[in-house]
């Protein structure tokens, strides 16, 4: 039995956004208690991951037929992808990294995998080789987030593009005025806060809306009739209202002497088109293209890193398997020592099993076995799993055959 035989016991059944609608996914959601209650009777380990984009069951066992039955009951088995061994492992690594999400690179999935992992452990459903696999997937997901933060940058939000533009041209310490607290204005305010801007004032015709948005992020707010003074005191002014008439006319802009940067993303335009130098959505599209290209490169690099971590995982997985077998050998060695101690006690050679000589026997057994156990671990790490397995199998054969201790 080689390493691939142990890996083949890792099985995944995944129903996700690539195959079905979110409505079908929601109709397939399982009761967690029922899933674990049933599957833990058939498999060594079980892991259930359910989000708005996926319903996935992972098991460690010889087949996945019992898990399949749960999807059959829901009527979605024909849309389920079945993954075995390293294909299943690769999938959960990519899921945890956000590379299999509907919005590729989104950050919520990593926390969802971690929550599901903790839930499964509390239930006693993880703790062996599958648990080790999920744990490594989470670790890799965190590494991907840390090394490639750009994969989480959104592309479609006007607010994110505005925040990125302002950050590039004026920096985080600039004084910013956001004119409008509707859907676009609110998105801009949120993105500015997420980016780290702190000196922001929100101006809106309905003061209560400006106040609510400002209080949410610790910003300032002002009524629309103070617009001109707010503009004069700002480094960047962002117009994002649905006003039908321009809020800033050319004669007003002439008084500003070009001091603030004017950004107009209002629909229709909030700024007189005759005012030169106004930044519009067209200029912001250039940033969007840059972000998209940067994100594509980051995703490619993240995928390559995952493949490297999978190579490392396979080596560590082999070591885990060997360590489990080593545990059995250790118990065998200690049992021999304990048997000899009991014989010595019975013969009156030592007082009891806690006698100094008895403890010395146990310590000696551990020391004698240590070089062998260390060697076996090293073989597993050096991708010589089969060689380590032959040695262990040979020892077991001797124990169960002519070399068995009496």
Swiss-Prot record:
It is an enzyme of class 1 (oxidoreductase). NADP(+) binds at residues 180-185. Substrate binds at residues 51-54, 101, 106-108, 112. Keywords: NADP, Oxidoreductase, Porphyrin biosynthesis. The keyword NADP applies. InterPro entries: 4pyrrol_synth_GluRdtase (IPR000343), 4pyrrol_synth_GluRdtase_dimer (IPR015896), 4pyrrol_synth_GluRdtase_N (IPR015895), GluRdtase_CS (IPR018214), GluRdtase_N_sf (IPR036343), NAD(P)-bd_dom_sf (IPR036291), Shikm_DH/Glu-tRNA_Rdtase (IPR006151). Its EC number is 1.2.1.70. Belongs to the glutamyl-tRNA reductase family. This is Glutamyl-tRNA reductase. The lineage of its organism: Archaea, Thermoproteota, Thermoprotei, Thermoproteales, Thermoproteaceae. The gene is hemA.
């Amino acid at each position: 039995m080689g390493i691939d035989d142990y890996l083949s016991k890792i099985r995944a059944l995944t129903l996700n956004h690539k195959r079905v609608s979110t409505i079908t996914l929601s109709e397939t959601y399982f009761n967690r208690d029922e899933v674990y209650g049933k599957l833990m009777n058939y498999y060594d380990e079980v892991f259930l991951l359910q989000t708005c984009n996926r319903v996935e069951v992972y098991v460690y066992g010889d087949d996945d037929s019992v898990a399949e039955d749960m999807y059959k009951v829901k009527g979605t088995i024909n849309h389920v992808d079945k993954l075995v061994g390293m294909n299943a492992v690769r999938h959960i690594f990519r899921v945890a990294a956000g590379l299999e999400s509907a919005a590729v690179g989104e950050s919520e999935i990593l926390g969802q995998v971690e929550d599901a992992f903790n839930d499964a452990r509390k239930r006693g459903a993880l703790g062996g080789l599958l648990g080790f696999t999920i744990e490594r997937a989470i670790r890799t997901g965190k590494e991907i987030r840390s090394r490639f933060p750009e994969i989480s940058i959104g592309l479609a939000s006007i607010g994110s593009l505005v925040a990125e533009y302002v950050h590039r041209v004026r920096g985080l310490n600039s004084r910013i005025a956001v004119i409008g607290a509707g859907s676009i204005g609110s998105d801009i305010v949120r993105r500015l806060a997420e980016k780290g801007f702190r000196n922001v004032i929100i101006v809106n015709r309905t003061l209560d809306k400006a106040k609510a948005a400002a209080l949410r992020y610790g910003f300032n707010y002002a009524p629309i009739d103070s617009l001109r003074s707010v503009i004069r005191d700002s480094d960047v002014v962002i117009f994002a209202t649905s006003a039908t008439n321009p809020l800033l006319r050319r004669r007003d802009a002439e008084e500003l002497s070009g001091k603030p940067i004017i950004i107009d993303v209002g629909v229709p335009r909030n700024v007189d088109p005759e005012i030169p130098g106004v930044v519009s959505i067209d200029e912001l599209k250039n940033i969007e293209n840059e972000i998209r290209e940067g994100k594509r490169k980051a995703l490619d690099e993240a995928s390559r890193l995952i493949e490297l971590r999978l190579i490392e995982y396979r080596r560590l997985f082999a070591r885990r398997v060997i360590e489990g077998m080593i545990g059995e050998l250790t118990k065998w060695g200690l049992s021999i020592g304990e048997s000899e101690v009991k014989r010595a006690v019975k013969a009156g050679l030592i007082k009891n099993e806690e006698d100094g000589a008895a403890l010395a026997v146990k310590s000696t057994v551990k020391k004698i076995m240590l070089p062998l156990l260390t060697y076996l671990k090293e073989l597993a790490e050096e991708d010589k799993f089969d060689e380590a397995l032959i040695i262990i199998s040979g020892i077991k054969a001797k124990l169960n055959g002519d070399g068995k201790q009496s």
